[in-house]
Amino acid sequence: MKFELDTTDGRARRGRLIFDRGTVETPAFMPVGTYGTVKGMTPEEVRATGADILLGNTFHLWLRPGEEIMRKHGDLHDFMNWQRPILTDSGGFQVFSLGDIRKITEEGVHFRSPINGEKIFLDPEKSMQIQDSLGSDVVMIFDECTPYPATHDEARKSMQMSLRWAKRSRDEFDRLENPNSLFGIIQGGVFEDLRDESVKGLLDIGFDGYAVGGLAVGEPKADMHRILEHVCPQIPADKPRYLMGVGKPEDLVEGVRRGVDMFDCVMPTRNARNGHLFTSEGVIKIRNARHRDDTATLDPKCDCYTCKNYSRAYLYHLDRCNEILGARLNTIHNLRYYQMLMEGLRGAIETGTLDAFVKEFYTSFGREVPELIV
């Protein structure tokens, strides 16, 4: 992977990630394909929304279908027929989400399979091996996602173990002679001194890119913004910056303003299945009865297949009847909305008009622009 930085506007960055399987324009949003599919979508449909790269889930793909079946197909690209870049998370966040059915030790994590209750062990070495079998273009280190709230001491212990796991991930990745890219994950909760220690430790190990983890786990938005403003300038300018698991459209805007290059989130797809649709004027809840006879399109500014062909009344009807097509059309729209937002942000950075773009974005929702600390 090669990262090219073209231009900046304030702290916002316009660039691209160049892989053997294709180029990803940044800032970029990655749709989430947890089980090797963006729910309800074919790869061609996902690509048509403007997506350059997908995120796959190491933890779930390890449990089903497993490494053996994956290797029989070649890798995840061949298995799901997506011949463009794929980033896979390490499984750390999913283990974090298991709560009481997992036990974290220095060696790794013991837990019971959420599928059949089988006892399973996952550690940094195994995570690297699984991601190697997936053929991931971007591999994420195995880390512990620091919970929120956490005391300074709890966050420190978690972050320092993640640093030790980062070194083990790096060593195993190198032992496997994996030709792809490995990203480190910055932890430390909401504590700036711990984030500093994490950044320094990861830079000493050396990675191809750096993610900011442990955010969007319940902390106030002000804390997320503060940590991003503190951490992003410490990441070398020639390395991509990835904000994991984020988020709402305004979170992407605020992340870009603070220098983030990459995002992922299940929100556009999950919300689509629940009838929450993002538009240039705010969220439309298509299940609201007011849309029963509404002949308007979802968003006159959107060029997606759904907006070009169907009315709000039709989408309301499909949802009321629990038709699969409704969820698919909603997903196409939400994914395209996110990609159009990223296209707009990239264009604004290129032309030096990001402030105006951000102001218009918030004005359309009747909201004030959040202040940057610096």
UniProtKB/Swiss-Prot annotation:
It comes from Shewanella frigidimarina (strain NCIMB 400). Substrate binds at D89, S90, G91, G92, F93, D143, Q187, G214. This is Queuine tRNA-ribosyltransferase. Residues 245-251, 269-273 are annotated as: RNA binding. Belongs to the queuine tRNA-ribosyltransferase family. One of its GO terms (biological process) is tRNA-guanine transglycosylation. It comes from the Bacteria. Its cofactor is Zn(2+). GO terms for cellular component: cytosol. Keywords: Glycosyltransferase, Metal-binding, Queuosine biosynthesis, Transferase, tRNA processing, Zinc. Pfam families: TGT. It is an enzyme of class 2 (transferase).
